[in-house]
Each structure stands twice: as C-alpha cells, then as structure tokens.
C-alpha cells in the first residue's frame, strides 16, 4: 500500500511539473518565428530591394517566464555570433593592414638598398674619374714641363746662335777696320 501511495504521488507530481514546461516552450518559438519571417510584399518583385527583418520589441509578459528566457537566450546567442563575426572581421582587417604595412616596409627597404647600391656605384665611378683626372692632370703638367724645357733649350740655342753671330759680326768688323775694306751689301736690291 505504501508503494501505491508513492507511485500515485509520483504520478501526481510528475505531470504537474512537466506540463507547464512543455506547453509554453513551443508557443513562443512559433511566435518568434512568425515575427522574424515577414513575407515580402508582392510589389517587391519589380524591385530588387533587400529588407532586413524588423524585430518588434514587445513588452515581455510576466506570465510566460520560460518563453522570455528562450527569446533572451536566442538574442544572446545572436549577439554572441554577431560579436564573434565582428571580432573576426576586425582581426582579418588588422592582419591585412599588417601584411600591407610589412610589404610597404619591405618595398622601402628594397628601395633604400638599391639607392645605396647606385650611390656607391656613382661614388666609385666618381673616384675613378678623379683618379683619371689626376693622372691626366699629371700627364698634362709633365707635357707642359717638357714643352717648357724644349722652349728653354730652343731659347738657349737662339741665344747661343745670336751670341755667335754677334761675335762673328764683331770679328768681321774688326777685320774690315784693320784692312780698310768696305763690306759688300748682303741685300741684292742695291
């Protein structure tokens, strides 16, 4: 008899606990689905307009606590997904920005190294040109010195010849004076 009372108590208690939980749960989900899925108007066939479903915020009823909880959990899950997607999007944007910045940095480094190489090449060419200029300058100075030396030698020869001619003229003049002979004119005009 005690077992029958326990089973009857269990039978009485279990439907009372389970019955309210089963009935409110399907109703709010169906209502929420009906609110979210609005059929597009017939006129929208002509226009390609994308409409976001408008969620109507109705005051929540105090009597259906389980339904409110389901709606809140659904909203919370939706917000969680949205925030995750937004965080992912921001992360991807940040990664893309970092990759682009790194590539730009690499391009700057490449440009700077190439510029430095070209400038080094230019300096090397300038040094070679300076050396050649110095060498040619030295050669030209040597040529000028050689020309000056030759000119001095030629001047010396001219001076020597002049001295010889003067000496010869003096000797001839002395000879003509001593002999009393008048020299012949060297010019054939007279």
Swiss-Prot record:
Residues modified to Phosphoserine: 14
Modified residues annotated as Phosphothreonine in this record: 58
Name of the featured protein: Remorin
Subunit structure and binding partners: May polymerize to form filamentous structures.
Lineage of the species this protein comes from: Eukaryota, Viridiplantae, Streptophyta, Embryophyta, Tracheophyta
Compositional bias per record (Basic and acidic residues), positions renumbered to this chain: 1-12
Organism for this UniProt entry: Arabidopsis thaliana
InterPro entries for this protein: Remorin_C, Remorin_N
Regulation: induction: 10-fold by auxin, 2-fold by gibberellic acid and not by cytokinin.
Stretches of the chain forming a coiled coil according to its record: 92-147
Pfam families noted in UniProt: Remorin_C, Remorin_N
UniProt region (Disordered), positions on chain: 1-45, 50-69
